Amino acid sequence: SIRSPRVRQTFKKIGYPENVSKVLGALCCLHRHLPQGAPTSPALSNIVGYEMDRKLAALAAEYGLTYTRYADDLTFSGDVFPKEQIIPQVKRIIRDEKFEPNHKKTHFMNQSSRKIITGVSVASGVKLTIPKSKKREIRKNVYFILTKGLAEHQRRIGSHDPAYLKRLIGMLCYWRAIEPDNTYASDSIAALKRLEKGY
């Protein structure tokens, strides 16, 4: 996570005076951290992590690998991954840039492994899909809403979220973005949007 002093420092680096940087840092942070889900957080975390990304991308290129990052998920991919040589260097770069590697989230996958990266399943090397467990969860919620009604479904699962339907439509839009040919996702979006108009 990125703490407010680093955010404040980022604003100073790009030219804001100390007092303005302090106010902007306070506005962009919640409980002294960049909050997940805020529209400002991705851009600020990318600015803060720029130097780390540059160093890790250069390291990956040395070994013929590709480096990508989404939020705090770092991915190195390639045909051969020399663990013993590259991992210590990755950890050093991360720590040099004042971040801490999360060992619990470190995974190594080979060609036959089930690969889920940033919530997307990578099948057959190139095909992107939503994990089956996520599809089952979405299908179940859509089914109960369309057969029992939104209010009854929310009562049954104990949800008081006024934006529940919008969130479910958002999940389906995400599914459709990953799998554009998936007719279930498109049909469900249309059905839930019709239902939404009645609320």
How should each PLM-predicted stretch be described?
Residues 21-29, 62-74, 105:
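Short, surface-exposed recognition loops or helix-turn segments adjacent to catalytic cores
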Residues 2-14, 18, 25-31, 35-38, ...:
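Right-hand nucleic-acid polymerase module
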Residues 37, 41, 62-79, 119:
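Catalytic palm active-site di-aspartate
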